[in-house]
Swiss-Prot record:
Its EC number is 3.2.1.-. GO terms for molecular function: chitin binding; chitinase activity. Residues 1-22 form the signal peptide. It holds the Pfam family Glyco_hydro_18. This is Di-N-acetylchitobiase. Residues 23-366 form the GH18 domain. It is an enzyme of class 3 (hydrolase). Belongs to the glycosyl hydrolase 18 family. Glycans are attached at residues 131, 177, 212, 246, 283. Coiled coil: none annotated. Keywords: Glycoprotein, Glycosidase, Hydrolase, Lysosome, Signal. GO terms for cellular component: lysosome. Involved in the degradation of asparagine-linked glycoproteins. Hydrolyze of N-acetyl-beta-D-glucosamine (1-4)N-acetylglucosamine chitobiose core from the reducing end of the bond, it requires prior cleavage by glycosylasparaginase. The gene is Ctbs.
Length: 366
């Protein structure tokens, strides 16, 4: 339909009408359906994977919620009432984004979805292999740049972020233009976990996010010319449970060789365990919680009903506080976690204390 015959006033109203036509505001107040415009000095970036545990989160800290579960309008309304953004998940096959027309269509769909759901941006979570000399290398950077331009043009105050591995050194065969992507979006969420996804040395259980190894990743990003203010540290609220082929007297747990993207061993030999499960298991374990000084991380050993020894590595308030201190001391943009649903939000007194301590660990110690 041609627009040339419409009065100028009507043309000015079109963006508003388009937003309203996406559906009436589900919040108690229409103002809560407006995008968040405030840019906090410090980000606390929370991944939520669904259900209603968000009602018990520490909203005094949260600045952004990446909604990776089913869309929940109640969450959006509540987050906005607390001044926090709620952003979409963005995932797409890299083979498709080589085509500029396909990119434009995908971006337009995401913008429309964000508008319809009164959301504040998008978190692009790709995590796919990219060869440095492939067309996907440049196309990925273009995708981020074009996504940022579209969202910021269409939704005032919107935020576009991109998830990267714990190190820029081609982890899991991901060769990305990190400096170009950082320049093209608001900030990078650095996934400082799953750091045993490629084990090149001994095939043994180790920390999900060893302290020194984690910090080396940030040093390498900054050496590339990426500003610390473009980096948000992601910490794990889960651990890995490994079956030990052999458990030595020194607590060395030899694990099954499971190759991953070229590496002979990986954390795929274990399985992920949320913090709430770990807390219920650790005190009844064979060893109780132990602290590894080299990796600055806790672990414990237990025996399953079949008589096999397991070793569980995880992060707790002690290990997370160390990393949060680095965030503060080196001026990073903020901190966040995968994922907020991993804690126990029940009415149990001990669980409540443990959950409060994990949220509290995100606050950098001065």
């Amino acid at each position: 339909m041609a627009l040339c015959g419409l009065p100028e006033f009507t043309l000015l109203l079109l963006p508003l009408l388009a937003r309203l036509s996406a559906g009436d505001c589900p919040c108690s107040e229409a103002a809560l359906c407006q995008p968040i415009r405030h840019r906090p000095d410090f980000e606390v970036f929370v991944f939520d994977v669904g259900q209603k545990t968000w009602k018990s989160y520490d909203w005094s800290q949260i600045t952004t919620v990446a909604a990776f579960g089913k869309y929940d309008p109640e969450l959006m309304c509540y987050a906005h009432s607390k001044g926090a953004r709620v952003v979409l998940k963005g995932d797409i096959s890299l083979k498709n984004i080589i085509d500029p027309t396909f990119r434009a269509s995908w971006i337009a769909q995401k913008v429309d979805l964000a508008k319809a759901q009164y959301m504040d941006g998008i978190n692009i979570d790709i995590e796919q292999e990219v060869n440095c000399s492939s067309p996907e290398y440049e196309a990925l950077t273009a995708l981020v740049k074009e996504t940022t331009e579209s969202f910021q043009r269409e939704i005032e105050g919107s935020q576009v972020t991109f998830d990267v591995a714990w190190s820029p050194k081609r982890i899991d065969k991901r060769c990305y233009n990190y400096t170009g992507i950082a320049d093209a979006c608001d900030f990078l969420f650095v996934m400082s976990y799953d750091e045993q996804s490629q084990i090149w040395s001994e095939c043994i259980a180790a920390a999900n996010a060893p302290y020194n190894q984690t910090l080396t990743g940030y040093i390498d990003y900054i050496k590339m010319g990426i500003s610390p203010k473009k980096l948000v540290m992601g910490v794990p609220w889960y651990g890995y449970d490994y079956i030990c082929l052999n458990l030595s007297k020194d607590d060395i747990c030899t694990i099954t060789k499971v190759p991953f993207r070229g590496a002979p061993c990986s954390d795929a030999a274990g399985h992920q365990v949320p913090y709430k499960v770990i807390m219920k298991q650790v005190n009844g374990s064979v060893s109780g919680s132990q602290w590894n000084k080299d990796q600055q991380a806790p672990y414990y050993n237990y025996k399953d009903p079949a008589g096999r020894f397991h070793q569980v590595w995880y992060d707790n308030p002690q290990s997370i506080s160390l990393k949060a201190a680095y965030v503060k001391n080196y001026g990073l943009r903020g901190i966040g976690m995968w994922n907020a649903n991993c804690l126990d939000y029940s009415d149990d007194a001990l669980a409540r204390e443990q959950t409060q301590e994990m949220w509290g660990a995100l606050k950098p110690r001065l």
